[in-house]
């Protein structure tokens, strides 16, 4: 930058006076320099006179003659050399501020330290300490000064300090090297820096930037005015940017030099501050960032082919971006415009703020209306929370009841305390409306009087609600008591029957507990071992009574053919009982042993009621039964129904006599009176062919045994049980009053378990649901285990599926979990002796 660029000719004498501006002519010498001489061109008139650095001065320092330019300004001297810049206090401070921003201020500090050391007295003791401090601070610690010095220079300084040969010029070589580096790099960058250009724009005389720390508080302000809130009023006092007397031209070089500061500037106490590294104020979210080219808006009109006659200025063509001396074609103007854009580039400006407005649906509402709507919503939320909390508390209570019941059952099983089924103690009114109970009551009455017709509808109708009917049931309940009218100690003690209330009846809480237990714990079919274990626990809770004491069973029957297994005395016999099969309805060990001494009139068999299962289990059994009936039955299953009559024909006379005595009792003649059908309750309906009672009971036992076992296991198990019953009858043929069920349980259990295990080892039951179908598929495979690959081969439909198999698990309260298996070599898990799986399609 030369001094000629800063000296301008003032066309108007009334313009503002500058120190470096030319002075008016001295009176009397106005004609010395005519404004226009003949023969001089137009360009020479407007050419400013160069101001040399060697202005005419008096040798005696008395000042300059009048009519000549003033001496060089500080800004002009700064551009001459680095010495001139550092020789001025403001220049040195401004240059130091620039180096601090560039993080190389140590070079300037080292240069001033060398100047100060050169002026120190060598005889002073502080000189050695200062030399060592300069060496350690700037040269020894591998700083930026040490990197710019030559190795020989650093070695010379180090040797001089070690030998304590201190000289005033020992740092001159290092200072010269640092000065040359600053002149080549930092000084040239400083002359084009934004901090220097702003100081030039302010004229160097503005005291606003010299206060509060001098030039360090210099701020460059450009762009839009600060964002103003709608409720505030803008005042000029908050705006610190003041117009400067001189303006630097907006050339591409100047714009590039000041782009970084203008893009990172901030306005104090303003709402809109723009900084690329800082997050945007939430008030202006969504407005984006604005990048405007450093050209006029008219250039954009030209670039958009909007050059028309009405868009051209008739007075001054410079407004339209067209030089006054050159009016070319449209393509030439576009090319010049594109070159101007490339030269200037894009100047980043702060993003233009947008007013943050409320959504349309947020309209003002009356306070009363708003309060009513808010209260209604809060009440609805409160009800939802309360219902959720009550449901959680209820589930927690049910869970605690289950845990408490499980602990009680475990304690009872350990102590061997006798328990009685709670459903047998319910009064008649609790199950009066249950159709299953009505059929069971009717069947028990029919079997009580096997030689008579079915009772009439008018007298013994279980649907009747008359007081006589209630009294009849109540008397039936009291008939469970022994002749003394009291329960025996084994049944009357609270420890024996903990579910009884204070008066011998089941309370409401107990009934709820019983229902919850048998619905949630016995919905899944039990295995044979579980049924036998529960039977051995309940068999202790019996009441050994006389001839008038009996208990009847409410057995869970099939949905189409209810079966019962009563153990009542027929024909007035006191010592005879019916030979029973061990099945799901008639559990082993329920028959009572004979009285001590083996008297003929000793034992009355006690039949305990089995629990009421879930209705869904009945539907499941009905589906299995329907599937069984639709398939052709094997020969073994067909021959089972006729097994007992054939065996009766082949049995010995003593065996037939024993069987006849068991059924005939003391009546002296076999049963000849036909019994009506179970469902024949209408007198007008013709009676069916009366079946043999013994064969019917055998069929009931067979069906009960089939319910708890797979289809192909029923035949073998039923035949084994029939063989055991007949063998027991043959062994006790000499004593016709003995009970076949009196055979030791230790001899029957190993045989039965061995048969079951042998059957399970030979055949494997596989049941699976396919792709969400409601009816499952069931297959029997002759294998001990099954892998996923073999299971896939059994599927008729091939495709991509997911395979889940049920297995026992303690992770959840249900005790089971479906596990996904994807490897063909994995052995499928078993649940309750069978494989239960689900096949789901991969979407």
UniProtKB/Swiss-Prot annotation:
Tissue expression pattern: Expressed in brain and lymphoblast.
Chain spans, region Interaction with beta-catenin: 413-476
Domain RGS: 81-200
Superkingdom of origin: Eukaryota
Motif (Tankyrase-binding motif): 21-30
GO annotations of cellular component type: beta-catenin destruction complex; centrosome; cytoplasm; cytosol; nucleus; plasma membrane
Residue span of region Interaction with GSK3B: 327-413
Subcellular localization: Cytoplasm
Bias (Polar residues) ranges: 727-741
Domain DIX residues, every copy: 761-843
GO molecular-function terms, A-Z: beta-catenin binding; enzyme binding; I-SMAD binding; molecular adaptor activity; protein kinase binding; ubiquitin protein ligase binding
UniProt region (Disordered), positions on chain: 1-75, 396-435, 447-494, 561-674, 718-748
Region Interaction with SIAH1 and SIAH2: start-end pairs: 334-393
Ranges annotated as biased composition (Basic and acidic residues): 56-69
Post-translational modification: Probably phosphorylated by GSK3B and dephosphorylated by PP2A.
Pfam family, one: RGS
Compositional bias of kind Low complexity: 477-494, 588-597
Function: Inhibitor of the Wnt signaling pathway. Down-regulates beta-catenin. Probably facilitate the phosphorylation of beta-catenin and APC by GSK3B.
Subunit details: Interacts with glycogen synthase kinase-3 beta (GSK3B) and beta-catenin. The interaction between axin and beta-catenin occurs via the armadillo repeats contained in beta-catenin. Interacts with SMAD7 and RNF111. Interacts with ANKRD6. Interacts with SIAH1. Interacts with SIAH2.
Disease: Colorectal cancer: A complex disease characterized by malignant lesions arising from the inner wall of the large intestine (the colon) and the rectum. Genetic alterations are often associated with progression from premalignant lesion (adenoma) to invasive adenocarcinoma. Risk factors for cancer of the colon and rectum include colon polyps, long-standing ulcerative colitis, and genetic family history.
Domain notes: The tankyrase-binding motif (also named TBD) is required for interaction with tankyrase TNKS and TNKS2.
Protein name according to UniProt: Axin-2
Record organism: Homo sapiens (Human)
Gene field: AXIN2
């Amino acid at each position: 930058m030369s001094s000629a660029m800063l000296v301008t000719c003032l066309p108007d004498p009334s313009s503002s006076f500058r120190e470096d501006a030319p002075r008016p002519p001295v009176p009397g010498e106005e004609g010395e320099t005519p404004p226009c001489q003949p023969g001089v061109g137009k360009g020479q008139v407007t050419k400013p006179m160069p101001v040399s650095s060697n202005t005419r001065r008096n040798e005696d320092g008395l000042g300059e003659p009048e009519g000549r330019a003033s001496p060089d300004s500080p800004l002009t001297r700064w551009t001459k050399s680095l010495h001139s810049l550092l020789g001025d206090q403001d220049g040195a401070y401004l240059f130091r501020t620039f180096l601090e921003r560039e993080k190389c201020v140590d070079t300037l500090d080292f240069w001033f330290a060398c100047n100060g050391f050169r002026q120190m007295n060598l005889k002073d003791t502080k000189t050695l300490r200062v030399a060592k401090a300069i060496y350690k601070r700037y040269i020894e610690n591998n700083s930026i000064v040490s990197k710019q010095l030559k190795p020989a220079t650093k070695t010379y300084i180090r040797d001089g300090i070690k030998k304590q040969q201190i000289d005033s010029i020992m740092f001159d070589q290092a200072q010269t090297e640092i000065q040359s580096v600053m002149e080549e790099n930092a000084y040239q960058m400083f002359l084009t820096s934004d901090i220097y250009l702003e100081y030039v724009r302010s004229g160097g005389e503005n005291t606003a930037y010299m206060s509060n720390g001098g030039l360090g508080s210099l701020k460059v302000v450009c762009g839009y005015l600060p964002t103003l809130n709608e409720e505030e009023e803008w005042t000029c006092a908050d705006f610190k940017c003041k117009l400067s007397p001189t303006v630097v031209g907006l050339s591409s070089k100047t714009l590039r030099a000041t782009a970084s500061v203008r893009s990172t500037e901030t306005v104090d106490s303003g709402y809109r501050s723009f900084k690329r590294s800082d997050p945007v104020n939430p008030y202006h979210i969504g407005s984006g960032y604005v990048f405007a080219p450093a050209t006029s808006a008219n250039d954009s009109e030209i670039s958009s082919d909007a050059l028309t006659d009405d868009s051209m200025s008739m007075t001054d063509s410079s407004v339209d971006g067209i030089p006054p001396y050159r009016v070319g074609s449209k393509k030439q103007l576009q090319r010049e415009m594109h070159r101007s854009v490339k030269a200037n580039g894009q100047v980043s400006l702060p993003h233009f703020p947008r007013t943050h407005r409320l959504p349309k649906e947020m309209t003002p509402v009356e306070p009363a209306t708003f309060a009513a709507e808010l209260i209604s919503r809060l009440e609805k939320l409160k009800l939802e929370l309360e219902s959720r909390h009550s449901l959680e508390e209820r589930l927690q209570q049910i869970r605690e009841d289950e845990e408490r019941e499980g602990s009680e059952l475990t304690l009872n099983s350990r102590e061997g305390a006798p328990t009685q089924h709670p459903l047998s103690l319910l009064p008649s009114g609790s199950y009066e409306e249950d159709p299953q109970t009505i059929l069971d009551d009717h069947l028990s009455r029919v079997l009580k009087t096997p030689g008579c017709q079915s009772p009439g509808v008018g007298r013994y109708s279980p649907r009747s609600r008359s007081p006589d009917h209630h009294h009849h049931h109540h008397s039936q309940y009291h008939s469970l008591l022994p002749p003394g009218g009291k329960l025996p100690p084994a049944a009357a003690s609270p420890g024996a029957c903990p579910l009884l209330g204070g008066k011998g009846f089941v309370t409401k809480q107990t009934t709820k507990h019983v229902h919850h237990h048998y619905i949630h714990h016995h919905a899944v079919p039990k295995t044979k071992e579980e049924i036998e274990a529960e039977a051995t626990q309940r068999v202790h809770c019996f009441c050994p009574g006389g001839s008038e004491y009996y208990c009847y069973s409410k057995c869970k029957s099939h949905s189409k053919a209810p079966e019962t297994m009563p153990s009542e005395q027929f024909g007035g016999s006191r010592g005879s009982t019916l030979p029973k099969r061990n099945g799901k309805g008639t559990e082993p060990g329920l028959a009572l042993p004979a009285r001590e001494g083996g008297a003929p009139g000793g034992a009355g068999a006690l039949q305990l009621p089995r629990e009421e299962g879930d209705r869904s289990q009945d539907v499941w059994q009905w589906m299995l039964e329907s599937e069984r009936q639709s398939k052709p039955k094997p020969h073994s299953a067909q021959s089972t129904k006729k097994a007992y009559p054939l065996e009766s024909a082949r049995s010995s006379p003593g065996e037939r006599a024993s069987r006849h005595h068991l059924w005939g009792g003391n009546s002296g003649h076999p049963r000849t009176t036909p019994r009506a059908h179970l469902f024949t309750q209408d007198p007008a309906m013709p009676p069916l062919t009366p079946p043999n009672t013994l064969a019917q009971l055998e069929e009931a036992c067979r069906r009960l045994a089939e319910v708890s076992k797979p289809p192909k296991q029923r035949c073998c198990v039923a035949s084994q049980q029939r063989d055991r019953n007949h063998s027991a009858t043959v062994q006790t043929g000499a004593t016709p009053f003995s009970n076949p069920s009196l055979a030791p349980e230790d001899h029957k259990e190993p045989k039965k378990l061995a048969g079951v295990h042998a059957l399970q080892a030979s055949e494997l039951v596989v049941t699976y649901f396919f792709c969400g179908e409601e009816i499952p598929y069931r297959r029997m495979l002759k294998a001990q285990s099954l892998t996923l690959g073999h299971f896939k081969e059994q599927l008729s439909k091939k495709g991509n599926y997911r395979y889940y198999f049920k297995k026992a698990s303690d992770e959840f309260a249900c005790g089971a979990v479906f596990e996904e298996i994807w490897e063909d070599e994995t052995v499928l898990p078993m649940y309750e002796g069978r494989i239960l799986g689900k096949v789901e399609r991969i979407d």
